[in-house]
Amino acid sequence: MRTKKRILIVDDAAFMRMMIRDILTKNNFEVVGEAANGDEAVAKFNELKPDLVTLDITMPGMDGVTVLKKIREQDPAARVVMCSAMGQQAMVVEAIQNGARDFINKPFHPQKVVETLRRALQ
């Protein structure tokens, strides 16, 4: 039997974290943790060692691209999928250039989220 992939959700908006958690748990992923800011995200990544991180691009304080860089300093093989609102193409490109596997646009379409994460985990 295949084990569930372990996911860390990072978003400053509790509602967005709840939406992603709901999509993932309904599709056989295990949400091992959540973080509401960049410092918490880096600490939880190091503590939990998830298979993949969903990471909001725009957060107060440390933005998602900076968090991505810090996570990849700790683990160059880390799998990270960025979450972005429309109009953030420049930041998405920067994130991909810094090692993000893919991105998902807000508002989320559940099937697109699942497909993107499964592809990033291959």
Predicted regions and their residues:
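Two-component/phosphorelay signaling modules centered on CheY-like receiver
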Residues: 14-33
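Acidic catalytic/metal-coordinating carboxylates
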Residues: 37-40, 63-66
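Active-site beta3 strand of CheY-like receiver
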Residues: 48-54
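Receiver (REC) domain active-site loop signature in two-component systems and cognate sites
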Residues: 59
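Short, conserved "switch-loop" micro-motifs in signal-transduction and mechanochemical regulators
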Residues: 86-87
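C-terminal output helix
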Residues: 90, 108-117
